[in-house]
């Protein structure tokens, strides 16, 4: 009987362990992701440059999606979307040693690195030659028979006939891409090599999760298989299509991967532009945010929604390659995204341009306890003003965006904590917390910080210190809405003072580094 009970509990533990890795993206996840690169961002996205930013990201950014880190066959700088080597991790963004150092620094700061996994296709030397790579005593080499029979619209088959080479007997399972050889994911050799590659990325290099590129090119069932083989906790696929197709792909992975919420992005673009399909009207139409055409709105799929408002395939590149960027209201777009369920992914150029504002939005999101599965209610949907209330597991957060944010005023149960160009945040007073509108970080000069008492007690005051000690009833005292001067590097601690008791303390670490002129 004792033996049977041990077997039973062992099986239960095993099933629980398997199930833990079967969701593709954690339930009730409160993290925020940063896309750590943009197109041709070879300077800003060097591993050494990103490593220096890890301390500043701590507490705000939980995951950083890195550019494809494997070595390519080209000798010039490339973004990595035509992969050649899998086990050689020296790229246009730095050496393998620098990559390992970056990922270790991220982990020390509570940040996970997401690998850009490009396995729909692979580059070759000539038409058919893949590299032979040896890792842990095993040599891995793909063959011409690992290339889809109808690759490159049949051009590869014609060349194979000319060269006397045999391709796979299987056609491509999805969309063809003529930039490289499309891999046959039904091939046992392809599956073996990709699984070894992904285990190498996770277990050796130290990546926390995977972003799968161009998953329209092969069946989602293979993503499920690869994730099962590696036991990865975070997986997101780039299925660039309409909402029904994205949901269908998630289902094909057996919900073992999240997906980028492209329709959420298009909702935001159309609201900002005031028109659909990338056109720009005279005025924005914020009511377009009131859409059910996205993953984020669906309670059955918002866990798997990675929301974004712009990425490297949409950003403005040049006059000859303008693509489909946000034309305006970048801050308001991000304010909306960061107040909503799903896992928000901030674009690196936005982070660089508006880091202070985005940090405050993230702080508000986390203070309210908003997760990828939180529920929300629309409060107003007008052309010039849109408001949603999201219920976190700690408090409620109302986001108001539009050309006339004053058109919506919440009840007295809310306190305004943030205001910027075409956006406002209101936090429910049930949060019972102090708030400062300037987030932790490094600044080039002193500044004024506004303190707010978010409390149901109308008599609540604020007490604060700037020496890192916990504030008491005898500390400096101000009323809600007051501003204080921060002129030097310090640790601000501010709390609510109610009936002689101090609660809801928030901590802000400020480094003031005056700009030092230099000769060019």
Language-model segment annotations:
Residues 10, 20-21:
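Cleavable N-terminal signal peptides
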Residues 95-131, 135:
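Substrate-binding cleft of carbohydrate-active enzyme catalytic domains
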Residues 1-7:
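Positively charged n-region of N-terminal signal peptides that target proteins for export
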Residues 29-31, 72-104, 134-184:
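Aromatic- and acidic-residue-enriched carbohydrate-binding clefts of CAZyme catalytic domains
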Residues 429-520:
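Short, compositionally stereotyped local motifs that mark structural "simplifiers"
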Residues 23-39, 49-58, 68-70, 74-82, ...:
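Active-site-proximal helices and loops of the catalytic beta/alpha 8
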Residues 185-197:
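Alpha-helical scaffold elements lining the catalytic groove of polysaccharide deacetylases
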